[in-house]
Amino acid sequence: MIIIGGTATNWIDERLSKLLVSRLVKIEHKVFPDGESYIRIPERLMGEDVLVVQSLYPPQDKHLVELFFILETLNDMKANKITVIIPYLAYSRQNRRFKEGEAVSTKTVLNLIKKTGATSLMVVEPHHYEELQYFDGEVKIADPIPDIARVINGKVTNPFVLAPDKGALNRAKRLSQELGCDYSYLEKQRDLTTGEVRVTNLPDLRLDGKEVILVDDIISTGGTMVQASQIAYSKGAKKVIATAVHSLFVENAYDRLINAGIKEIITTNTIPQDTSKVTIVDVSESIARKI
């Protein structure tokens, strides 16, 4: 088994190579003056089983097209089994048609990954598990929640896990089981035109003296986490920590979270981060466990 390090790996390919004791082949890559990408696989891989590591963090479209180039090249080389490992799957939030005429972006992305040569797929903590049915092949999911829980355990003594919306309820349950504490969730409603989010159902939370851990799969603008933090403090929380597997931090999200009283942000390396601002959990071990 050979690991192919793509153009957007954030060192996960190198860590996997060490964990799995597998040879790593790095893609040769450059960008032409007009912005087009060039890739070359520098070894012959006929008959080989390969693991392609390529995350789809911004610029998503560029990294996605480069993944297609890698997969079709491996297919042309007649590699045997081609497993694609995607730490962060872009377009996962557009997994259904919210308005008439909208593209189901997740479906298109996964269909093209299959058609360009992937025989199997692994994703780290997808937005919705159901969306992976669009990939016509073997699918595995890497779960970094136990690894995140180990980091949190060393920071809290009286934890309570809170999902900022119902979609994150399963993650909250899993994290609470790892931490051995209670959990709950908020309900929100998003305006499909403006993107504005508001809490529509507030449970009877008693958080006096609790260290509240907000958990979600993605932090984008941080709006959902900001509201959840404000609610947690209004219910008596002693401290609020935010954790998400994939953190994009767009539109000054980091500053908004800190200004909302969040004392620490724990995330993973599926997307490159500023290590001076956040605590980072490596997802390589969770990926290796599934191979």
UniProtKB/Swiss-Prot annotation:
Involved in the biosynthesis of the central metabolite phospho-alpha-D-ribosyl-1-pyrophosphate (PRPP) via the transfer of pyrophosphoryl group from ATP to 1-hydroxyl of ribose-5-phosphate (Rib-5-P). InterPro entries: Pribosyltran_N, PRibTrfase_dom, PRTase-like, Rib-P_diPkinase, Rib-P_diPkinase_arc. Its cofactor is Mg(2+). This is Ribose-phosphate pyrophosphokinase. It comes from Sulfolobus acidocaldarius (strain ATCC 33909 / DSM 639 / JCM 8929 / NBRC 15157 / NCIMB 11770). Signal peptide: none annotated. The gene is prs. Keywords: ATP-binding, Cytoplasm, Kinase, Magnesium, Metal-binding, Nucleotide biosynthesis, Nucleotide-binding, Transferase. Mg(2+) 1 binds at H127. Pathway: Metabolic intermediate biosynthesis; 5-phospho-alpha-D-ribose 1-diphosphate biosynthesis; 5-phospho-alpha-D-ribose 1-diphosphate from D-ribose 5-phosphate (route I): step 1/1.
